[in-house]
Amino acid sequence: MPDPSTYRPAPGSIPVEPGVYRFRDPHGRVIYVGKAKSLRSRLTSYFADITGLHPRTRQMVTTAGSVEWTVVGTEVEALQLEYNWIKEFDPRFNVRYRDDKSYPVLAVTLNEEYPRLFVYRGPRRKGVRYFGPYSHAWAIRETLDLLTRVFPARTCSNGVFKRHKQIDRPCLLGYIEKCSAPCIGRVSAQEHREIVLDFCDFLSGKTDRLARDMEREMNQAAQELNFERAARLRDNISALQRALERQTVVFGDGTDADVVAFSDDELEAAVQVFHVRGGRVRGQRGWIVEKTGDPGDSDLQGLVEQFLTQFYGDQADLVYAADTEADVAPVPREVLVPVLPRDAEGMTSWLTGLRGSRVSLRVPQRGDKKALAETVERNAKEALAQHKLKRAGDLTTRSAALQELQDALGLEQAPLRIECIDISHVQGTDVVASLVVFEDGLSRRSDYRHYSIREAAGDGRSDDVASIAEVTRRRFARHVQDQQAVTEYAAEGHSRKFAYPPNLFVVDGGAPQVNAAAAELSELGVTDVAVIGLAKRLEEVWVPGEPDPVILPRTSEALYLLQRVRDEAHRFAITFHRSKRSRRMTASVLDGIPGLGEARRAALVSHFGSVAQLKKASVEEITAVPGIGAATAVAVREALIETDSSAPSSGATEAVLPAMVENGVDDTPST
């Protein structure tokens, strides 16, 4: 029996968006399908306390060997995908959770004179059309409640229908116009059947014709001055449009298409495909592929070309091997990709030959197809992130990565503590740096630090080297200071996070950056820290004083770890840079006034409308603002007068920065 802790995803790695998740057993069989408004909340509930789960749920969690998910745009999409996958996979725990009952479906009795819509369980009957299955009966009732506003078809039982026919009075739904009331002859049997057929067409994805027909009837009613009917049709059209907007997973034109998306880094790529048949998502597949390293094959155009060739070639082999006369085409009518391959015309011709009829290969630009393409892309990004996190989170993998780093760099011991710095700026302005810490191959966010660069400024590119040198000097000067005080603090029970050096110090860059960092360490007398640089373009590892870089194998766990450390430093630096730039751009002359906090500043600006109007106000007028006393009003007035009489300076910007940032380090733990 698998241990749930062996496949439990990290909570932070699970998206908060709505989606559908699948538990698989160790053999890869789907044993449970579920949907969630928030994937993170739902999935973490399965692993929080195994003993507190329902016995059936606990059995499912302990039987499963893996869990995966698909992100969608809305809860409606998640519901729809859940239905399709329950029908496709027939998961054992889903069925048994329903107490061995069949899943409910939406039945339409086309074999009756007055067809009706209702929730149904049981064997299929001739002359009845079914939509579903659904996981819950309430989902069908919600669908009926929404659509009977537009398609007022009968939903009552035969007994209720006969009773109201006898008393010649409609039920409540008839009075509120959610039923066309065929029981009292408000519509004929043929008119009611047409309403039901339109309802079926809508659920089948044939929405364009319905919208056109309603619009034509609305215009005709308006021309006949039947404005009440025209208004009702207008409301029906709006209701249809709202229903379609909530279902961006569905193509309104009922087309067959494959929607393909990629997410890649320097070494690998994730590809996701949503298979749309009849306008609805019928399946989803995903792969992680290793890049070849050839620029022609590793860019997005090359990835698209390789995927189309291999995937549809294999599909054609499967279809024709099973039945040479099969009417199932290996290629759908449309293939939607993020970019066209280099030889788009040749690829289209090849796909057309496989299908036996014209295939449209294109990039979606707008509408529901563009929306679905964005959903598929989100899933590709999630798949790649999960793949990388799984590799990094595995203890064996992390141990192998540290051992590979030790061997490749000739270190005396495995680099159990790795620190990495990265510089972020825009053309030399708002230059900041980040320092991230990894211990045992995992991030230690409580030790992350921000730096505001004080000495380097200028054209940006050339200042990267000076900025690297400054951050290195300040970080290890702090290490020297902490090392001197470590005995004193240890006696008092305090920990000094920088009292010991990292085993490996990584800088983002090549030989110039690495040599600058090594020079600073040498000047400070730090000799027990290995320094390397990781260059982005070719992922080369540079060592100080060496003319050539160290080339790690592209599939090595050591390179994966270095990439992850470097990418985390880059993310952390960009986040701080954006925050600092935003504070500078929104700094105010009121920021540095003693006794004037954020709430009082907002009250002043709200009362006077702008700082310019505030400058014209007297002390008495400022005092009239709620929460502003006489002393504060005088301070505000004096500060505004002083600002007008002096040239603008950067003091306002510096005043809003925390004290530790002015000293070079923000000691607030960051996430």
From Swiss-Prot:
- Alphabetic keyword roster: Cytoplasm, DNA damage, DNA excision, DNA repair, Excision nuclease, SOS response
Q: Which GO terms describe its molecular function?
A: DNA binding; excinuclease ABC activity
Per UniProt, subcellular location reads as: Cytoplasm
Q: Where is this region: Disordered?
A: 645-671
Annotated signal sequence is none
**One of the GO BP terms on file:** nucleotide-excision repair
Domain UVR, residue spans: 208-243
Pfam families recorded: GIY-YIG, HHH_5, UVR, UvrC_RNaseH, UvrC_RNaseH_dom
Q: Which family does it belong to?
A: Belongs to the UvrC family.
Which NCBIfam families does UniProt cross-reference here? PRK00558.1-5, uvrC
Q: What does this protein do?
A: The UvrABC repair system catalyzes the recognition and processing of DNA lesions. UvrC both incises the 5' and 3' sides of the lesion. The N-terminal half is responsible for the 3' incision and the C-terminal half is responsible for the 5' incision.
The record describes its quaternary structure and partners as: Interacts with UvrB in an incision complex.
* Protein name per UniProt: UvrABC system protein C
Q: Native species of this protein?
A: Mycobacteroides abscessus (strain ATCC 19977 / DSM 44196 / CCUG 20993 / CIP 104536 / JCM 13569 / NCTC 13031 / TMC 1543 / L948)
